[in-house]
C-alpha cells in the first residue's frame, strides 16, 4: 500500500490548526483527527471502536482520540503521539508560514531572501533541496500522528478483507505533551479500560516521536528519562537593613541551595555510557510584593531534575540534607562577613534555630490547626481557579500553596520547605520492566509477565523491518532525555507514587493520575518516528522520504512481524 498522499493530506490538515498547548485549538485538532478515523472504511463499519475520551476535569474540553482495529487474538500494538505544539513567536512576521506547509514551497523573491535570513545555513540548504517539509508540528509531532492514521487505515482494510487476520491495532492521539502530559495521564485509564473490555494484551507501544540520524543510523529509544520539579521555599528572619546581621536573608539561604544543586554532577546518572543532564533551576526570587528596607523574609524557586533510576524519596532525602547545609553555609558566611565589617552599629550575632521540612510534614502541622479543613478547601479552590484561567502555571501555583501553608502553620523561625511541582515523569526503560519492583511485582499483570530485555527484543525486530524494507540501519538508545509520554507506560509502583503525592501541593483535582491504572499499565515501548530537525524552532522540518515512504513501511512490516509471532 502506498501511503504518500494520504499521510501528506493528514499532515497538512493537522498543521493548519494552531493547536498550541493549553489552548482551545487542541480540541479543534482532536476533532479533526477523530474525523479522519471515522471516515476510514473500517471505522465506518465499526463506529463504536473509535471516538474521543474526555480528560476528566479538563477546562478546555480536551480528549484522547482513539481507534481500535480488532483482529483475532489478544495481542495488541499501540501507536500513539501528541497533537499539541509549542507557540510560534520565533516566526515573527512569517508566523502564517508556521501553519501552511504549502506556502513554504511558493515563497520567492525578496520574501524568500528575508525568510532565509532568519534560518540557519543547514535549514536554508534543506529548504533549497526540496527534500524537507517545513511548519510547526511537522516534526514534533504531527508527522508521526499522520503516519499512525495511515497505518490504522491499512490495517483496518486488511481486517475487513481478511477477517481471520491476527492481532489488534490501537491508535491514540493525546493532548498536552509539551506542557504537563494531561493527555497521556488520561489515556492510561482508557488503555486499561479497553484492555478489560476486549481482553487485549498490550505487547508493544510505539510513540511516533521524531527520530534523528547519528553516524548514519536512525535512532530509536527504548526508554525515557524521569523528571521531578522540586520546589523550594525558604523563610528567614526579617530585619531592617541597618540590622542585617540580626536577621537572616531568605535569598541568601536559597542562593546557597542553588549553588549546591545547579548543574550538580552527583545528580547526573549514567547508564550504559549514556549520561543524564544535571539539575537546573527555572525560577528563583524573593517573595516580596512591594518595596521596603527589610531583608526578604521569604524566597522561593523551582528546578528541573532528571533521572534514570532515582526515586522521588531519594531526591527528597538528598535535597533535605542539602537544605540543612545551605542554612549552615549561609550562616557561617554571615559570621565571617560580620567579622570583617564589625563596628559600633552592628548588633551581636544572633543564633537562629532552623529546620528543613518536606511539604507533607508541613501539611501535617497545618492539619492539626483549628479551622484547617475549610481554610484549605478555600485556598485550593482559589488557586485552582487561577490555574484554570491561566493566571498561574503549575509551578507558580505550587509556590503559592507552600507560602500560604507556611503562614497558616504559624511557624515563624527560619525554615526551608521542599515539595514537588507538576509535571512528574517516572523514569521508564523497556528492558527493565521485568525487574522486581518494591511492591514485589515482576513484569506486570499481563499473562506470562514481561521478560527482562523486552525492549531490546522489540528494537531488534524493528531493525530487521528497517533492513528488509528500506535497507536502513537503526541505532538503539536507552533513554530519551527530552521527556516523553513513555514515562507513563512503566507502571510505577504505588508506594513511590504515594511518596510523590504526599509532597505535591497541587495533588488532587488540579493535578492527578489514576494510580491504580498507572500501576497496572506496563507495556514495552519504543520511541520511533520520521527523521526531523529543529523541533520548537522556526526551522522545524521533517524529511519527506522518511515521513511518506520509509517509516510507514517499516512500521507496517514491524506490526506484521509482531502478530506473526503471537
Task: Describe the predicted segments one by one.
Residues 30, 46, 339-566:
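An extended, acidic, His-containing surface patch that forms the Zn2+-binding/catalytic region
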Residues 192-399:
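Midchain, well-structured core segments that form catalytic/ion-binding scaffolds
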